[in-house]
Amino acid sequence: MRTFDRREALGLAALLGTSLLTLSGCESGEPTAADSSAPSDEGEDGSLYVPAEDDPYATGVHHATIEVEGYGTMEVALNANVAPITVSNFCHLAEEGFYDGLTFHRIIEGFMIQGGDPQGNGTGGAEKNIKGEFSSNGVENNIPHVRGTISMARSQDPDSASSQFFIMQETAEHLDGEYAAFGNVTSGIEVVDAICESVPVEDSNGTVAAENQPVIAAISVVD
């Protein structure tokens, strides 16, 4: 397992590079969309997703399950009181079946797993981007990037997140205030551990060959 210093170095490199989460796939660098590829999820028309005024997912705490083929199911709590745009976007994409059959394309043991890219390489996203709900982008967000946190990948553009997300295996405080954390795993974190421990990666950026990428069977909104 990599040390925290290594993870931090990768994260900073991704942020500067093109995303950790794009960091090859995340959507942003650190998890920049995690890697150099931060995906820069810019909708086709360049517009940002805005929840409807009566959107039930834009307030309160919601719950969803993330089922990964061959690994099991994670249960997550999503806090729209902190990140209403992010939670609304995620829940609606899940309800549409957007995530079903997509993969985790970037995996860094001791750091995080990143997925939700229809291209499977950190460069794709949904039709629209969302505003980055984190402090360096002018939005208060007190959810820390600790073990089990779910957060959005992005590119260097603070408003470039779209569909790619990452789940923390270990704490990475340097991501706080720079990425839109919007919930946490409440059950099944061992799924993340199993993925990190068993999936072979191609490089230090956590790139996973297409044939080895864990498949998201379904993301289902519970309430």
Question: What are the residue ranges of the model-derived segments?
Answer:
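Cyclophilin-like peptidyl-prolyl cis-trans isomerases
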Residues: 2-223
